[in-house]
């Protein structure tokens, strides 16, 4: 994946192997860094929540039940499944059944003519036999 893969941390190599197992042979190095950041942030959040649950029950050590509870609370907030296809189809049919409004000509912003535009190209095509002098800017 990356040219300096031998210098990468162990977790980056693990993510690289996971990507390869999914059929992704090449990617930008930023992809692996972003996945590492997500994994570290998600793991840290889960462990902090598990510690809060353990403290709430009066324990100083985190148990597997604390981690499971923390994971269950995270899944509902972070990994929301998309709505069913049939539901999206019904909504799109309802929205698309209304015709688009045609704006009034009075309420539109009028664009100035191209001759007065600042970015207009100002050029003339001169014939070889023309007596007009060429202007050079």
UniProtKB/Swiss-Prot annotation:
Keywords: Nucleus, Transcription, Transcription regulation. Functions as a component of the DNA-binding general transcription factor complex TFIID. May also function as a component of transcription regulatory histone acetyl transferase (HAT) complexes such as SAGA. Binding of TFIID to a promoter (with or without TATA element) is the initial step in preinitiation complex (PIC) formation. InterPro entries: Histone-fold, TFIID-31, TFIID_subunit_9. The gene is TAF9. This is Transcription initiation factor TFIID subunit 9. Component of the DNA-binding general transcription factor complex TFIID. Component of histone acetyl transferase (HAT) complexes such as SAGA. GO terms for cellular component: SAGA complex; transcription factor TFIID complex. GO terms for molecular function: protein heterodimerization activity; RNA polymerase II general transcription initiation factor activity; transcription coactivator activity. It holds the Pfam family TFIID-31kDa. The keyword Nucleus applies. It comes from Encephalitozoon cuniculi (strain GB-M1). CDD domains: HFD_TAF9. Belongs to the TAF9 family. GO terms for biological process: RNA polymerase II preinitiation complex assembly. It is found in: Nucleus. Residues 9-71 form the Histone-fold domain. Gene3D superfamilies: Histone, subunit A. It comes from the Eukaryota. The lineage of its organism: Eukaryota, Fungi, Fungi incertae sedis, Microsporidia, Unikaryonidae. The keyword Cell inner membrane does not apply.
């Amino acid at each position: 994946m990356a040219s300096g893969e031998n210098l990468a941390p162990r977790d980056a190599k693990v993510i690289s192997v996971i990507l390869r197992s999914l059929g992704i042979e090449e990617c930008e190095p930023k992809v692996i860094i972003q996945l590492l950041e997500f994994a570290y942030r998600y793991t840290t959040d889960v462990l902090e929540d598990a510690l809060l649950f353990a403290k709430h029950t009066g324990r100083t050590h985190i148990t597997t039940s604390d981690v499971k509870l923390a994971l269950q609370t995270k899944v509902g907030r972070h990994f929301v499944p998309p709505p069913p296809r049939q539901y999206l189809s019904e909504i799109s049919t309802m929205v698309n059944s209304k015709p688009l409004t045609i704006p009034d000509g009075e309420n539109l912003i009028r664009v100035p003519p191209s001759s007065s535009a600042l970015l207009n190209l100002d050029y003339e095509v001169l014939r070889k036999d023309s007596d007009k002098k060429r202007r050079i800017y």
